[in-house]
């Protein structure tokens, strides 16, 4: 065999991600945040918190989707009164989101919430209340998130900078953190959110360089599902690849479950969380001899919740089809109204197009049974869905 030297130097294999930023670690209701702990995914309920049943139902849906920590709004006394039962019955840690009224901070702490988010920009006389808040939080072991938002920046900071710049967000956050530190309270995480992902990225870079508190990433008011997903993926991708970020919330004008799906997907794509279901599909073209869109959707739907990691290739034409299918645990290379079914690189049968999805699902179940019997994966890995590649 002839060896061709292209003159490209060998580069030692290493992660394309920077090492995680070293940060303090806090405990949010049993979920560790910072200090090298896995990056957690958060969301926020859209129900009236006072409607306990509706709120707990939505929290259950978020939990099933993979949410690690949930936040609930608390704008009224009725909402505050609902916090004890919600905090007690929720399957995941509950954080109370407090604006305007400092009395609800104390109510949330007393209710047993796993954490409290405070917005120093709009809580009345917040600076004067820090000593009491710090003492109450310390007494109950309740971490506090200092959540600075571009849309509700402290008026004093806004007057100084003229607009919510990255520097303004960071100054506000660090100032409030310093007030807690004066009272020997350090069980803190910080967020500096902005609707512009590039301003947000700059703010978190500045913040990460000046403090070791764990950081909660978020693009505030990111927009509808598509736009918000793009903004969050760009911002989170940049920061997480630089090792910045300890917990994330994708803010979308969409059902909260979608926020969780996007957040988990971002972490999976960066290799920061084990992959589950991943649809990698071609945009289709004139070479496609099957309905790739329909096939991809049916395979994805059929394999939701698959209990083991599995790579499945669903190929729409003969250009890359056979090669990709052979590289997968399970796959199909389609053409001329039929599909060759591959299992672990070997063709096992050819089926009509109408039977492709059914056959793939049957083979996936058979592989799952083999994996279960062999004990290839522990209980902690026996969740989620397979990796599906569609071409």
Swiss-Prot record:
Pathway: Isoprenoid biosynthesis; isopentenyl diphosphate biosynthesis via DXP pathway; isopentenyl diphosphate from 1-deoxy-D-xylulose 5-phosphate: step 5/6. Coiled coil: none annotated. It comes from the Bacteria. [4Fe-4S] cluster binds at residues 282, 285, 317, 324. Keywords: 4Fe-4S, Iron, Iron-sulfur, Isoprene biosynthesis, Metal-binding, Oxidoreductase. GO terms for molecular function: 4 iron, 4 sulfur cluster binding; 4-hydroxy-3-methylbut-2-en-1-yl diphosphate synthase activity (ferredoxin); 4-hydroxy-3-methylbut-2-enyl-diphosphate synthase activity (flavodoxin); iron ion binding. It is an enzyme of class 1 (oxidoreductase). Its cofactor is [4Fe-4S] cluster. Its EC number is 1.17.7.3. The keyword Nucleotide-binding does not apply. InterPro entries: Dihydropteroate_synth-like_sf (IPR011005), IspG_bac (IPR016425), IspG_bac-typ (IPR004588), NO2/SO3_Rdtase_4Fe4S_sf (IPR045854). GO terms for biological process: isopentenyl diphosphate biosynthetic process, methylerythritol 4-phosphate pathway; terpenoid biosynthetic process. Binds 1 [4Fe-4S] cluster. It catalyses: (2E)-4-hydroxy-3-methylbut-2-enyl diphosphate + oxidized [flavodoxin] + H2O + 2 H(+) = 2-C-methyl-D-erythritol 2,4-cyclic diphosphate + reduced [flavodoxin]. Belongs to the IspG family. Converts 2C-methyl-D-erythritol 2,4-cyclodiphosphate (ME-2,4cPP) into 1-hydroxy-2-methyl-2-(E)-butenyl 4-diphosphate. This is 4-hydroxy-3-methylbut-2-en-1-yl diphosphate synthase (flavodoxin). It comes from Acidothermus cellulolyticus (strain ATCC 43068 / DSM 8971 / 11B).
